[in-house]
């Protein structure tokens, strides 16, 4: 019985901590003059707490595993809600497809150039050049 109570406490604590970060993010978003969603601010707050180890990762790990395990079910209502606007999506299908293609190509180009920049061949300090080695 004690083991069951401990397990329930871990799940409850994890979900409460995640929701507290979400509610804090919503409160901060309501106070800010810029339009950043509260869920994004809450996620950044949770990330900051975890990365500075103010909140140990083991406290939220059970809740995160639970949410990730059933993430597919969380997207079903969103998909059904999108189908409510099927006629509008069909009317604007061309611009939607073009914007998806352009944004995908832009991401590919930026990632390609960034990858080339960070993985370029660099000179090793103190190693003689090939031209100097031949002399």
Swiss-Prot record:
Chief place of localization: membrane
Instruction: Report the membrane topology from the UniProt record.
Output: Multi-pass membrane protein
Q: Does the keyword Ion transport apply?
A: no
Query: What GO cellular component term, any one, is given?
Result: plasma membrane
Record keywords, A-Z: Cell inner membrane, Cell membrane, Membrane, Transmembrane, Transmembrane helix
Origin organism lineage: Bacteria, Pseudomonadati, Pseudomonadota, Gammaproteobacteria, Enterobacterales
The places in or outside the cell where this protein is found are:
Cell inner membrane
Q: Superkingdom of this entry's organism?
A: Bacteria
Q: Which family does it belong to?
A: Belongs to the UPF0299 family.
UniProt xrefs under NCBIfam families: PRK01821.1 (NF002494)
- Indicate the transmembrane segments per the record: 4-24, 30-50, 63-83, 93-113
Protein's UniProt name: UPF0299 membrane protein Spro_1570
